[in-house]
Amino acid sequence: MWLPLVLFLAVLLLAVVCKVYLGLFSGKSPNPFSEDVKRPPAPLVTDKEARKKVLKQAFSASRVPEKLDVVVIGSGFGGLAAAAILAKAGKRVLVLEQHTKAGGACHTFGENGLEFDTGIHYIGRMEEGSIGRFILDQITEGQLDWVPMSSPFDIMVLEGPNGRKEYPMYSGEKAYIQGLKEKFPQEEAIIDKYIKLVKVVSNGVAHAILLKFLPLPVIQLLDRCGLLTRFSPFLHASTQSLAEVLQQLGASSELQAVLSYIFPTYGVTPRHSAFSMHALLVNHYLKGAFYPRGGSSEIAFHTIPVIQRAGGAVLTRATVQSVLLDSAGKACGVSVKKGHELVNIYCPVVVSNAGLFNTYEHLLPGNARCLPGVKQQLGMVRPGLGMMSVFICLQGTKEDLHLPSTNYYVYHDTDMDQAMERYVSMPREKAAEHIPLLFIAFPSAKDPTWEDRFPGRSSMIMLIPSAYEWFEEWQAELKGKRGSDYETYKNSFVEASMSVAMKLFPQLEGKVESVTAGSPLTNQFYLAAPRGACYGADHDLGRLHPRVMASLRAQSPIPNLYLTGQDIFTCGLVGALQGALLCSSAILKRNLYSDLKDLGSRIQAQKKKN
C-alpha cells in the first residue's frame, strides 16, 4: 500500500525539484565565483588610521554611492558576506551599520589599552582544504589567516562537592574520541555510537539547505507524509532533543553532561536543543579549532574592500529607521536617521541582516507587519537567552601567566537543564549566587600577533548566561547613565564569576588590572540584539523543526526584501555565511553552491596539472 504512494511522491518531488531548479536559478547574473581570487595574505595592518578608513566610515548622504543595486541593513558577517558576494557579481552595494564600527559580532573594541573580541572566540574547520576555509578565501581573497589553537581546544570543568574533574577535548577525531574513552572506559561502545551518529547527521546538513529552496507546499506535503524525517538523518535529528538521543544511546548522566558541554555555543540546554544542531557543532570542531590571526576585526577588515572595489560602501553610525515600500507593497529602499532628520535611500533590493525580530517588528511599516506571512514567521520563533560578557585586562604575557589558548567551560551540576531552569527562574537578587556555567578564554593567548601589539599584557574573557528580565528596568536609561544600582547589580555577577576563575587560575591573583562587564542591555545597544540575545532567534527544537527551517528563508513575505545572517540558517560565523549564500543565491537567481563546487573542482584539477 505504501510503496505506490512513496513512488508517486518521489516522482512528483523529482519533477518539482527540476522545475524549481530551473526557475530559481534561471537568472543571467554573473558568477561571483568564476575564478580563484585567493592570494597570499598581506602583512597585518596595525595602523589605526588605516583601519579606521575601512571599519569606521561614518554615514553621510554625500558618501552614499549613486545607482545602488542593493542596500544591506547591518554589517555583521551575514550582511558583509552577502554584500561581498553580490559585489563579486557586479552589484553596487551599500551596507549600513548603526554602531560606530563595522563588523557586528566580529568587531573588536578597546578597553584600558587592550583589544577585546565581542563574538568570535573560536572557529572550526578552517584548515587548508576545508570547505569553510575555501569559501571564506574566495570572499576575502585569501586575506584571512587562521591560527590553530592548542590541543585540547576545549576543557569541560565540573566543579562538584567531591572536587574538580576536567574533561579535555583534543584536536583530531582519533584524539578526541580517545580523550573521551580515557575518562569513560566503561562506555567506549556508547562513545563510538555517538561519534558515528554525529557524523551521519552532520553530513546530511545539505538537506536543510535544500529545504530553503523547495516550495513550501511541497515541504508541507512531505512533512505530513513523514518523508522528510524518514529519509534524512539530519532532518530526523532536528525533531529529537540532544538529551533524548543521549539517553537512547544509554550514556550515564556524567557522560551525557560531558557530551553536552558545548551547548552554550548555541544557547539551548540538552532537553530543548535539537540533536542536529549539536551534531553540527561537534563535527565542526572534531579536527580542532582556529582563531583569526590579528583578531576577529580582521574578518570585516578584509571583507569590506571587496564591496568597495565594486563601487559600494560600508557606512557606520547609520541607524535604519524603516524599510521603504512602494505603492505595490514592494521594498524600494530604506530610511536612515541622521541627527534629527531622515535620509531616504532608494534601491531595487533591500537585504536585512538585522534579524527576524528587528526586521519584522521594527523596520517594516505598520501595515506590512500585519501581513500573514510576517506574522506566521514571527510566531514560529522566540528570542534566545541573553548573555553577560566580562572583559579582564591582565598584567603579564601568556608565558608569564601560563595562559592556554584552550577554552574552559565550567559547570557545577551534571543536570544542565535543571541548573539552567533553576537559575533563570530565580529572583534577580539571588541569581549571581547560582551561576550554573561559565565560558572562560584568553584571546591574547590565541593570537600570535598579540605580543607585538600589546607587549607585556594579556586579555581574558568570561561569558555568563543571563535573563534579560533581570536588567529590564534599566532598558530606557542611556548607556553609561544607568546609575549605581545597575552597576552594583552587574558587579555581583562579575565578583561571582571572578571568584570561580581565580580558583581555576590561581596564578592570576594580583595580575588583574581592570574588569569591565556588559549585560544583555549592552548587547542590545551595540549589536542591536533584541533582549540581548546574541544568537538571534532561539535555537530550540521548534526553530530547528524541518517545517520551520523551510519557512525561514532568504525571500521574505515582502517582495524585494531579503533576509541574511544567522536567523536564516544557524548561529555562528559559518551559520551566518550559509545565510549569506542562501540570500545571494536568491537575489542572483544562481545556485552559488554549484558555482563554488565547480570552482573547487577547477582549482583541484589545476593543482594536479602543476
From Swiss-Prot:
This is All-trans-retinol 13,14-reductase. GO terms for cellular component: endoplasmic reticulum membrane; nuclear membrane; nuclear outer membrane. It is found in: Endoplasmic reticulum membrane. PANTHER family: ALL-TRANS-RETINOL 13,14-REDUCTASE, BLR7054 PROTEIN. Residues 1-18 form the signal peptide. It comes from the Eukaryota. The keyword Endoplasmic reticulum applies. It comes from Macaca fascicularis. Catalyzes the saturation of all-trans-retinol to all-trans-13,14-dihydroretinol. Does not exhibit any activity toward all-trans-retinoic acid, nor 9-cis, 11-cis or 13-cis-retinol isomers. May play a role in the metabolism of vitamin A. Independently of retinol conversion, may regulate liver metabolism upstream of MLXIPL/ChREBP. May play a role in adipocyte differentiation. Its main location: endoplasmic reticulum. InterPro entries: FAD/NAD-bd_sf, Retinol_saturase. Belongs to the carotenoid/retinoid oxidoreductase family. CrtISO subfamily. Pfam families: NAD_binding_8. One of its GO terms (molecular function) is all-trans-retinol 13,14-reductase activity. Keywords: Endoplasmic reticulum, FAD, Flavoprotein, Lipid metabolism, Membrane, NAD, NADP, Oxidoreductase, Signal. It is a peripheral membrane protein. It catalyses: all-trans-13,14-dihydroretinol + A = all-trans-retinol + AH2. Its cofactor is NAD(+); NADP(+); FAD.
